[in-house]
Amino acid sequence: MTGKGRTGGTSRSLKPYAGRGLFMRIVQKYGGTSLADVRKLRLAARRLAGLHQQGVQVVAVVSAQGKLTDELIARARQVNPRGSVREMDAALAAGEQLSASLMAMTIGALGVEAVSLTGWQAGIRTDGEHGAARILRVDTQRLEQELTRGRIPVVAGFQGLDPEGDVTTLGRGGSDTTAVALAAWLRADRCQIFTDVDGVYDRDPRIFPDAAKFGRISYDRMLTLIGSGAQVLHDRSVELAKEKNIRLEVLSAFTGDPGTIVG
């Protein structure tokens, strides 16, 4: 199943999308630095709640907060430096689950119903490659039910369930891939990736003040940049976006500046 993303920002003029008889549907992904503290959680929650109040069906995908994934890895290696990849995946998945619960509660404090979902509760099915699993499909029934009930599903990124019923993780940056997969199987109108930078640059703007931002960049050029060390998007997310024809928007989680369209 494929989906087509639509460009543009999250303006106040958004209205229910009548072109297919459904509300406009948006998937938004928030990275760990975008959720690192209560203030940042509230900023993201207000953006999500605002869209919901405009009649938009919005799904959030969240990463683990701050450096929590690194802390979980350190804890696991402390108890067993050679622990199994299966158990490591089970441990690491907890970081995103915590973020999802905190985000759902933060949205709820704004008077909007939200529900946190693990990757498997959201229907994400993967192969059995622990630590680097690939998404095979998304069973969207639960997500569709929650959207129909008027809730904001907050999905723990980076994780899924393999054919044996075990938890898997998608590798570093895997929450980007989660967002693209949900956008594809839910036939979302937009897939927005919120980060700590306001788009895709030809060089790291935190190191090079004269770095130039792309207004738009092709999938292939984006993959080339990733191959050269750019970390703004996970390579598998761009590959999946290209395969499923999902247009991505890379945006700052902290400013209203225009971002970069990928695709």
Language-model-detected regions and their locations in the chain:
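Residue-identity detector for glycine
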Residues: G3-G9, G19-G21
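Proteins with a high burden of low-complexity, intrinsically disordered sequence enriched in S/T/G/P/A and R
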Residues: K4, F23-R25, D89, L251-F254
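Nucleotide/pyrophosphate-binding catalytic subdomain
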Residues: L14-E239
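A conserved active-site cap/scaffold subdomain adjacent to cofactor or substrate pockets
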Residues: I226, Q231-G263
